[in-house]
C-alpha cells in the first residue's frame, strides 16, 4: 500500500506558479532569434513566396539588390522587433500553461506538446499578429514604391490609408491564414520536438523525469522538430499572397484562404504552394532552437538566478 501511494505521489503534476520573468524571457528569446538569422531567412522566404517564379538564388540576389546586407534586415526595426517581443511572450506563456493543463488531464508529453503549441499559436495570431503583419506589409509597400520611382510614403501614412479604406479588417487581412499557420507551426514544433526528445531519452537511458538532457541533445531535438514543421509551407504561401501589395490583375478580389489556395494552385501548380520551403526549413530550425531548446535552458538559468520556478517546460 505505501508503495502505491508513493507511485501516485510521484506521478502528480505540480502546478507551476506564473512568473513575470518567464513572460519577459519569451520576448527576449524571440528578439534574439529575429535579430540574428531570423530576419534574413524571413526576408528571403517571403520574397520567394511573393515572387513564385524566383529560385532561391534569385531571391537572395533580389534582396541584396535592395540594400546589400541591410536588405536582409528590412523591416527589423521597429516592426519585426514589435512582433517578436509580443508573439514570443504570448507563445511561451500560453503554450506552457496549456501544456500543463493537458498533462493534468492525463495526456502524454507528445499530445500535450502539440496541443500546447496549437493553443499558443492561435492566441499568438489573434492577439498580436494582425497589427504586426500589417506593419510588415506597410514596410514592403514603401520599398516597392521607392524602387518604382514614386514618392515613398511613411509607414504610418500607408497604415492610416489602409485603416481609412478598409478599417479593422484591412489591418488584419489574412489573420485567419496566420492563425492556421501559427497553430500548425507551433503544434508541430513542440510536439515533434517532444517526440524526438522522448526517443533520445530511451536511447540514452534517461527515462527518469529528473534526468536532464544535455544541451546538444536538447538543441538537436528542437532543431529536428523545427525542420520537420515546414510541412505546412502552403499556408505560409497563402498568407503572403493574401497580404501582398504586389499588383496582379489576375488575383481574385476579397481573397479568402480557399480562394487564395485555388488561385496559387491554378497559377503555379503544387510547386508554387511550396515556394520558399528551403529558407522556411532553416527558419523553422533557428526559431525552434531558440524558443524550445534555449527556452528550456534559459528558464532553468532564470530559476537559479532569481529563485523563481519557471511556468513549465514546453
Swiss-Prot record:
The chain crosses the membrane at residues 23-44, 77-97, 111-127, 178-198, 218-238, 273-294. Its main location: mitochondrion. GO terms for cellular component: mitochondrial inner membrane; mitochondrial nucleoid; mitochondrion. Residues 246-259 bind DNA. Strongly inhibited by mersalyl, p-chloromercuribenzenesulfonate, mercuric chloride, N-ethylmaleimide, pyridoxal 5'-phosphate, bathophenanthroline, and tannic acid. Partially inhibited by alpha-cyanocinnamate and bromescol purple. Weakly inhibited by butylmalonate and phenylsuccinate. Not inhibited by 1,2,3-benzenetricarboxylate or carboxyatractyloside. It comes from the Eukaryota. Disruption phenotype: Shows slow growth and respiration defects in minimal medium. Shows growth defects in acetate-supplemented medium; the phenotype is enhanced by addition of hydrogen peroxide (increased oxidative stress) and/or double knockout of YHM2 and ZWF1. The cytosolic NADPH/NADP(+) ratio is decreased compared to wild type; this effect is enhanced in the presence of hydrogen peroxide. The mitochondrial NADPH/NADP(+) ratio is increased, but only in the presence of hydrogen peroxide. Levels of cytosolic citrate are reduced, but only in the presence of hydrogen peroxide. Keywords: DNA-binding, Membrane, Mitochondrion, Mitochondrion inner membrane, Mitochondrion nucleoid, Repeat, Transmembrane, Transmembrane helix, Transport. One of its GO terms (biological process) is tricarboxylic acid transport. The keyword Repeat applies. It holds the Pfam family Mito_carr. It is found in: Mitochondrion inner membrane; Mitochondrion matrix, Mitochondrion nucleoid. GO terms for molecular function: DNA binding. The keyword Transmembrane helix applies. It is a multi-pass membrane protein. Solcar repeats lie at residues 18-100, 107-199, 217-301. Present with 2930 molecules/cell in log phase SD medium. PANTHER family: CITRATE/OXOGLUTARATE CARRIER PROTEIN, CITRATE_OXOGLUTARATE CARRIER PROTEIN. Belongs to the mitochondrial carrier (TC 2.A.29) family. Mitochondrial antiporter which catalyzes the transport of citrate and oxoglutarate across the membrane. Also shows specificity for oxaloacetate, and to a lesser extent succinate and fumarate. Transports isocitrate, cis-aconitate and L-malate with very low efficiency. Does not show uniporter activity. Helps to maintain normal citrate levels and NADPH/NADP(+) ratios under conditions of oxidative stress. In addition, associates with the mitochondrial nucleoid and binds DNA in vitro, although the relevance of these data in vivo is unclear. This is Citrate/oxoglutarate carrier protein. The gene is YHM2.
Amino acid at each position: 500500500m505505501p508503495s502505491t501511494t508513493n507511485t501516485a505521489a510521484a506521478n502528480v503534476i505540480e502546478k507551476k506558479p506564473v512568473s513575470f520573468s518567464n513572460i519577459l524571457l519569451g520576448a527576449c528569446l524571440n528578439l534574439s532569434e529575429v535579430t540574428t538569422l531570423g530576419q534574413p531567412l524571413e526576408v528571403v522566404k517571403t520574397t520567394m513566396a511573393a515572387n513564385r517564379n524566383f529560385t532561391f538564388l534569385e531571391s537572395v540576389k533580389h534582396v541584396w539588390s535592395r540594400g546589400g546586407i541591410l536588405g536582409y534586415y528590412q523591416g527589423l526595426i521597429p516592426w519585426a522587433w514589435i512582433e517578436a517581443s509580443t508573439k514570443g511572450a504570448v507563445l511561451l506563456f500560453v503554450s506552457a500553461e496549456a501544456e500543463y493543463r493537458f498533462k493534468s488531464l492525463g495526456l502524454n508529453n507528445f499530445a500535450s506538446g502539440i496541443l500546447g503549441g496549437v493553443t499558443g499559436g492561435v492566441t499568438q495570431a489573434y492577439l498580436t499578429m494582425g497589427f504586426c503583419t500589417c506593419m510588415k506589409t506597410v514596410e514592403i509597400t514603401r520599398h516597392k514604391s521607392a524602387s518604382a520611382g514614386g514618392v515613398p510614403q511613411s509607414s504610418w501614412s500607408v497604415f492610416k490609408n489602409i485603416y481609412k479604406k478598409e478599417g479593422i479588417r484591412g489591418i488584419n487581412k489574412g489573420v485567419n491564414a496566420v492563425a492556421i499557420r501559427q497553430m500548425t507551426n507551433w503544434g508541430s514544433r513542440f510536439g515533434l520536438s517532444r517526440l524526438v526528445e522522448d526517443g533520445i531519452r530511451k536511447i540514452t537511458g534517461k527515462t527518469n523525469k529528473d534526468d536532464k538532457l544535455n544541451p546538444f541533445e536538447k538543441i538537436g531535438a528542437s532543431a529536428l522538430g523545427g525542420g520537420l514543421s515546414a510541412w505546412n509551407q502552403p499556408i505560409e504561401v497563402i498568407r503572403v499572397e493574401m497580404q501582398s501589395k504586389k499588383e496582379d490583375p489576375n488575383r481574385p478580389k476579397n481573397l479568402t484562404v480557399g480562394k487564395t489556395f485555388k488561385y496559387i494552385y491554378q497559377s503555379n501548380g503544387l510547386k508554387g504552394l511550396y515556394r520558399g520551403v528551403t529558407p522556411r526549413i532553416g527558419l523553422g530550425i533557428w526559431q525552434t532552437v531558440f524558443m524550445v531548446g534555449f527556452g528550456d535552458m534559459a528558464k532553468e538559468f532564470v530559476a537559479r538566478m532569481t529563485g523563481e520556478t519557471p511556468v513549465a517546460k514546453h
